[in-house]
């Protein structure tokens, strides 16, 4: 991230609150998009005793952490609260919050909550098993990660909460509510509930009614970058912001991340490499996948949607490999003062493209309708230590992540007819120079890596700036503020190697899935209801 401590002539700053799966951040930017300071705190989503798959979002504790982060960011920046011209919030998608008639939050779950597996199955069976297709065709979402199964679970198991609830929002909107006292949702995040229409960008209460659920809990919809309200006296005392600071509608983390990357026009494409890898393609108009392999989300740019595929646990797989097998490299990296992944990339760069035919089996391509994966493994190892070693396996993992991304982009292109002419690679994965080059070689496309690594927070700050009139338009501002660190061009010889590796992986992965189907191996992950 660009960080500059020089004086800001305008004296005006923007704050973004970024509520991720594992942590929350308050980030301060100047009007040129430079990060000035940040406060961060980790949070944990605890399971509810005797509720398998549950991941409760602790509203009281997590609000205290948010306030702590805001105060920390202001202190680090050495800025008075009056310098903050506006604040917006973004969050992990899918996580929902319920409120009572007094507007008080009473229940919330994180995006990873999977307690409603039985309810997913029940809803799938509705209307001769056509209900999920109707939901997807309208909203771009399947039931696996949606809000309706969770609401049905509450109706079954916590009717006290279900009947108390008078409003529903996403976690980003909860942050804004705690600051302003106002309740609303934005399309980009609320779209992941499976209850919002891709075309109208408004709720579809008939979907809840078809599921036998209440439709009177849907909060007003406001677009990203519009004014929600102002910081209240109570919130100001708690978090340190000034009373009356404008609170602007934020949105979903990936969509705001794309705004921060300047991915705001049709056909522009990003690969965001974190714990999960998202492959995101801007579509010029709402369209869904007849095979239901890909999720479709509203962009923060009105009128535009994004096809999004997800590779599972890509970053987590690399961390597992580092921690399980590379203790020696971790010690060496510490002594040299370098990142362990950088050291492993230097080793892997000496391994030829194709990694001597080693095929990692971890995440499958995204199959949203029936989403599960094979058991983790490496296929086609040899016992030649010169060819099969840590460097080879590390390179094979990087190549495999790029291959799965390319396959997901192929699936999007097949139903949308949108073919990107370049990629933006962002997130933690883009720090790897070798990984960036491999992604270019596998896809055959130029790959641009931005200087800004925290693009989600920047996109959120842009929304805040538009909402208070400091920027004219979100899309144009995103394009203006993004700066590029490097562009990688595909190596034609490597492209040929990877085309064969891609075909081999697809065939081998299909066979590995049959082992899971027969109960012989354990899936890396499977969606609720399967």
Curated annotation (Swiss-Prot):
Organism classification: Bacteria, Pseudomonadati, Pseudomonadota, Gammaproteobacteria, Enterobacterales
GO biological-process terms attached to the record: carbohydrate metabolic process; quorum sensing
Function: Catalyzes the phosphorylation of autoinducer-2 (AI-2) to phospho-AI-2, which subsequently inactivates the transcriptional regulator LsrR and leads to the transcription of the lsr operon. Phosphorylates the ring-open form of (S)-4,5-dihydroxypentane-2,3-dione (DPD), which is the precursor to all AI-2 signaling molecules, at the C5 position.
Keywords: Cytoplasm, Kinase, Transferase
A GO term, aspect molecular function: autoinducer-2 kinase activity
Main location, first listed in the record: cytoplasm
Protein name as annotated: Autoinducer-2 kinase
Enzyme Commission code(s) on record: 2.7.1.189
